[in-house]
Amino acid sequence: MKKLNEVILLLKNKKEAEEFFKDLCTPTELKALEERWAVAQLLYQNTSSYRQIAAQLKTSTTTVTRVARFLSSEPYQGYKKILKRIT
């Protein structure tokens, strides 16, 4: 993970990031990452229930619950750090 993080930090712009992640991940993996990020954003806004978020994004409540756990109680708090920067 450490080496991958170092490489990600070398990306210079959105285009490079998109190209890199399209090479690195399958379309299914990219969709899963995008889905989790969308869930995190909606949870952070705190305006919808888990079921509403799952229905809106056409994802499972399991995914919503997992992302919610990382937002609220996991030690890394990576979602929150970025969400605070962009809001």
Q: What are these model-predicted stretches?
A:
Residues P75-T87:
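Short Lys/Arg-enriched helix C-cap and helix-to-coil transition segments
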Residues A68:
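DNA major-groove recognition helix of helix-turn-helix
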Residues N46, S60, L71-E74:
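The DNA-recognition helices of helix-turn-helix-type DNA-binding domains
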Residues A17-R36:
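Short, Lys/Arg-enriched anionic-surface-contact patches
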Residues R51-L57:
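Short alpha-helical "recognition helix" segments of helix-turn-helix
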Residues E34-S48:
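Short, amphipathic alpha-helical "recognition" segments used to contact nucleic acids or chromatin
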